[in-house]
Amino acid sequence: MKLSSEKLPKNPFSLSQYAAKQQKFFQWKKEKPDYYLHANLVDTALQFLKERIRRGDAMAYFLRGQLYFEEGWYEEALAQFEEIQEKDHQAIYQLGVMYYDGLGTIANAEKGVNYMRKILDSSCPQTMHLKFAAAYNLGRAYFEGKGVKRSDEEAERLWLLAADNGNPKASVKAQSILGLFYSMKEPKELEKAFFWHSEACGNGSLESQGALGLMYFYGQGIRQDTDAALHCLREAAERGNVYAQGTLVEYYYKMKFFTKCVSFSKRIADYDEVHDIPMIAHVTDCLPEFIIKGMAMAAFYHGRCLQLGLGIMKDEESAKHYYSKACRLNPTLADELHSLLIHQRI
């Protein structure tokens, strides 16, 4: 299970709130409507921050680095954060993320871990909004064994610290990951998994909303409840959870809603493997592993409908294309589904 870093937690000094206090920042909107183009907006923001820096505004240094980071200009962001790390804890946090993930520099997990420890161990009040996220990231390092010796026990301890008993202001990402952690470890602790997915879902986690649907569907950690399962899965699917979408495709097929299955499965199966998966992961904060699994499931069932002419005109050549895509995306899942097909259970 490949995890991702926790994004920089919001604090009262976001770029938008900061800029909103500076009326001159928005004058260009009234004077030059064509500047609504994104590139011009970024350029205007940079010019504004440059002027604030010239006037001695300390916060503007970090905001410039963060703007570089959000635009994907990682080398410039790294240089800016390195310059101000002694004066800005948010810069330290971002350096931890960048060194661990290799953004704008060669990955150095040990260095990334050290930066995160600085945040977690700091007694400075200005680090309070960063501590839960730093604990999540350190837990990730122990889970992956990067920069530290691998330890599921230490990962669990840090994630529990980050999750803070379901506090909505803590790390919702940690709450969701705990749900996955308890459902995947041996022996499984499904009641704990259900609890943490419930907490994370209540705090807005799309990943956990889909996971709850599956747990209700199969009666894992909770009594089986198909209505509750479909409610969770449909809401998660509408919000962009691709694994939930793939699970609904399977449900529609088994219930013989073939027309619905075909139209829904094609849309999911036709996602681009190279470009769409990273984009969906970024927008939804869902793990690529499960996005790929949802796509593979949709591709396989779409292929089956095409092969048999269920809800669509029979087309064996197109069916082969979708079967191949399912195998390419997730060979293990495709093999399991093919086995069910051979035994006439699909």
Swiss-Prot record:
Cellular compartment(s): Cytoplasm
One Pfam family it belongs to: Sel1
Highest taxon, organism lineage: Eukaryota
Keyword GTP-binding tagged: no
Assembly information from the UniProt record: Interacts with LRP2.
Function: May act as an adapter that regulates LRP2 function.
UniProt protein name: LRP2-binding protein
